[in-house]
């Protein structure tokens, strides 16, 4: 990523303070060309991401959190922001960092666009940000198809500040307000509850309440639960934002301390992830029932995901599923606790596809199946979780490949053919190590290599006229040479330069095609292995019946 000239930095953040960070970024890029950083012209805003950040996004880029904790209360000395998500253990995972020295709509848009370019991947399906107009507009410009959510705990925090007099005068207001926002099950129920609170406490003309009501589609649970946000819960929990740097970067952190704290946070979370990986692989959670479905979930999910599943599964013992309509292959159930039918949920079940949908939408929101669908599965004697309800991102095999760093080549391999060679060699070494673990894996690896060799050979010998990404035809080598000779008759040296440039472009494209094909094959292998493991699990469960 090209570095743009640094302009005069704003406010109290001096060049000397930022220079400490820039020197670190330059050194990291020299050590690893896959480390990217960029500086916004005229503003001095800085962005950076290492290869692990970009690899994390390929695994867990199904939702994004833009953490701007530094903006709360203007107490922070360092305007440090982070792009984060959730890994398969529910832990925060880093996608990139930024220093935001100048806040404007265009600066946030630049930052989002730069981050997206660095990820070399599609935009996230959903994003969580603090409630702020500048950020909201920038998100709509860059992530036009991404579902925007405002941090609910942040809104609660600001509501408590702006309505402190109400909280003090009316002790019941807080619980009523939270229940209205988090516990209502339909839009109509929310509207009725909100209207009741506003009228009862004479707050019809309160500007703050009116503003957050107008934005209800972006933060009230009943309106956002149909979208995946990567949290192992139907609410946002106690954290303000998914802060990867909580406990490491705070109001006392100076620019000189930032890099040290940044690296401490990365090391800490890496260690926590490794411990969670080890626990998931080498220990078995305690079963609470003799159900084969619970055992299946324990063998596939990470510990954090399994605990959430187990909570839902155990609750099925107290919520019967009652049929309210049945058309043969499609059955509708009402699922509720004994004596609480008015708080129940509706589940539609397709017996042909073994597919169910619940009005609580917990699976859509968190990726873990809800107790209501599990109760229907129990009633229909479904003993194994269908594969559609086992999101790979919550399983022990969420990371398709074991590599932690993987350079991206957004412009093919023109920047460095040596980097291409070294990257492929590193990947091949890791592939060999995995493929030599057993005879069975070796055979699979050899078959994949044979297939890869065929695809690479086909790509290398592709016919002239290959399409470019912008839809223009890529001319044949002869045509390019003719054009070079015709359009540049001014000298042999210039013609040679153009020929070498063209050859470099072709080599870069072949390198990129080879890399893409190899990655595709490896992903296919991992997906087939995952699906096979599900089939084996289901087969074992069938034998036990």
Swiss-Prot record:
Residues 66-150 form the MULE domain. GO terms for biological process: regulation of DNA-templated transcription. GO terms for cellular component: nucleus. InterPro entries: FHY3/FAR1, MULE_transposase_dom, Znf_PMZ, Znf_SWIM. The keyword Glycosyltransferase does not apply. Keywords: Coiled coil, Metal-binding, Nucleus, Zinc, Zinc-finger. Pfam families: MULE, SWIM. Expressed in hypocotyls, rosette and cauline leaves, inflorescences stems, flowers and siliques. Residues 460-495 are annotated as: Disordered. A zinc finger (SWIM-type) spans 345-381. Induction: Up-regulated in hypocotyls by far-red light treatment. Residues 492-545 form a coiled coil. PROSITE patterns: ZF_SWIM. GO terms for molecular function: zinc ion binding. It comes from the Eukaryota. Belongs to the FHY3/FAR1 family. Putative transcription activator involved in regulating light control of development. May act as a negative regulator specific to phyB signaling. This is Protein FAR1-RELATED SEQUENCE 9. It comes from Arabidopsis thaliana.
